[in-house]
């Protein structure tokens, strides 16, 4: 059983959902993002998504695009991202790590080499937002060879013909994009989520995480009442950005502010079903 499957099984046994926070690698610098990564499990993270900075993040809104620019300016590369995971694993063997990004950096690295190095570093799953199932052969084989889950995105616009294809090529969990458009732009209503989830449940036995548009503890709690996990990205990145100084450097309270927000989200998720 994979680390992702074990974590979801353990949470299901406790009848609680998962909180999946997101951070952008090397935002605003390598050491700050590593310190944040290391502190996230203690602040309430059940799984963690690490964004791989890319120069053309077309699925992301302005907040995460700005984070990607900061990460690239700080020297982020795929090798540095994997090094960060390796260093995280020195102190945490249990928290699942998912890399989220775009195909271009993986192709530049070499898909087979990337999957081998990612697994060796301690990565558990991959979300490649611009890799449709029809073109996934180049990554699915190497990922399976090294025990990496390929997490698929399902959107409100995914119709009943396409949904089984997407789910058939997925492992780990399904990432339900709760809104149309880019990240961080609006929030799905509870009614919209309640209507969408039964269709997903009928198509897959995998856990379902809801992302894109979850910003507050209340929204995270509402998400895990109908799904298995809530992903929070733009809201945490916005808090980090607000803590930076005029030159874009980490402030004295950067970690404290982001982790306090994460703790509030974690409390809401833990208590959502009680």
UniProtKB/Swiss-Prot annotation:
Q: Which GO terms describe its molecular function?
A: tryptophan synthase activity
Q: Which residues form the signal peptide?
A: none
For this protein, the Enzyme Commission number is 4.2.1.20
According to its UniProt entry, the function of this protein is described as: The alpha subunit is responsible for the aldol cleavage of indoleglycerol phosphate to indole and glyceraldehyde 3-phosphate.
Q: What is this protein called?
A: Tryptophan synthase alpha chain
Matches recorded under Pfam families? Trp_syntA
Q: What class of enzyme is it?
A: lyase
GO cellular component terms, A-Z: cytosol
Q: Which residues form the active site?
A: 49 (proton acceptor), 60 (proton acceptor)
Q: Amino-acid biosynthesis as a keyword?
A: yes
Pathway(s) of this molecule? Amino-acid biosynthesis; L-tryptophan biosynthesis; L-tryptophan from chorismate: step 5/5
* Assembly, per entry: Tetramer of two alpha and two beta chains.
Which species is listed as the source? Gluconacetobacter diazotrophicus (strain ATCC 49037 / DSM 5601 / CCUG 37298 / CIP 103539 / LMG 7603 / PAl5)
From the broadest rank down, the organism's phylogenetic lineage runs: Bacteria, Pseudomonadati, Pseudomonadota, Alphaproteobacteria, Acetobacterales
Q: Which family does it belong to?
A: Belongs to the TrpA family.
Quickly give the catalysed reaction: (1S,2R)-1-C-(indol-3-yl)glycerol 3-phosphate + L-serine = D-glyceraldehyde 3-phosphate + L-tryptophan + H2O
Q: Which UniProt keywords apply?
A: Amino-acid biosynthesis, Aromatic amino acid biosynthesis, Lyase, Tryptophan biosynthesis
Which superkingdom heads the taxonomic lineage of this protein's source?
A: Bacteria
